[in-house]
Amino acid sequence: MPTRRGSCVLHLLSSQEPDFLSAHQEALRFLQDLVRIDTSSPPGNETEAARYIQGVLAYEGIESQIYEREPGRGNLVARLEGNGSKRPILLMGHLDVVGVEPDAWTEEPFGAVIKDGYLYGRGSQDDKGMVAVALEVFLMLHRSGMELDRDVILMAEAGEEGSPQLGVQYMIDEHFPEIDAEFALNEGGSIIQQNDRWVVSVATTEKVSRRCASSPTAPQATGRGHCRTIPSYTWPLPWPSSVVGNTP
């Protein structure tokens, strides 16, 4: 089952135009609530976050199941049924987060404080933001009442941060029919980031013909000369090197 990484916009074809502003505000509330649930891995505690989502879905009349390989490491799965003319699509994201060093934070890492237009909190991007958006899209589809050509599956998984045997691998091994889909929409994409460039030292061994270093027949006739021919490479940017204007 391939995973398509990146952003996805679902165009909802219904008789009533979706209220995207309300959807944004609701998704933001979901995100804040999820961030405030400490799911640092280890120990994880994803089941508490899964139960929160289960409560949201139950309020809308949507059934869901939580699957655990170990106590507290829950994976939530819910499904909207389509007419079956196409294979399902899977909306997914993970509930666990990397541990924090509180002293390194300017805001409480599980406070989900919004300040100057930014939400501060562990997991706000990786990956509870994705979970909140997937949940909102799932609810919008349900509320629209539109006929779906395919089932839409929502999975909020455990164990992505180093313990896939408790999350997606467990679901594949033990409950694959529940998540079997034509493709999945997961986290990822070309996000502008800092501090992702590293210095790497590389040692190589060059095999060349024996020559006297004082009279090589070509620049690459000696190992040192050969190494000098290794070109440097700069990756071209597919976008302008400067950003002009404001982004929403």
Stretch-by-stretch model annotation:
Residues L119, Q125-V202:
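Acidic/histidine-rich catalytic neighborhood of metal-dependent amide-processing enzymes
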Residues D196-W198, S215-T222:
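Flexible glycine/proline-enriched surface loops and loop-helix/loop-strand junctions
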Residues L28-L31, T47-A50, Q54, V131, ...:
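Extracytoplasmic/secreted envelope proteins and their assembly/folding machinery
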Residues R73, K86, E107, D149, ...:
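Short, solvent-exposed loop/turn segments at the edges of secondary structure
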Residues L12-S124, L141-R150:
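Acidic/His- and Gly-rich active-site-bordering loop/insert found
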Residues F176, S190-D196, A203-T205, S209, ...:
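Acidic-enriched catalytic cores of C-N bond-cleaving enzymes acting on peptides and small amides
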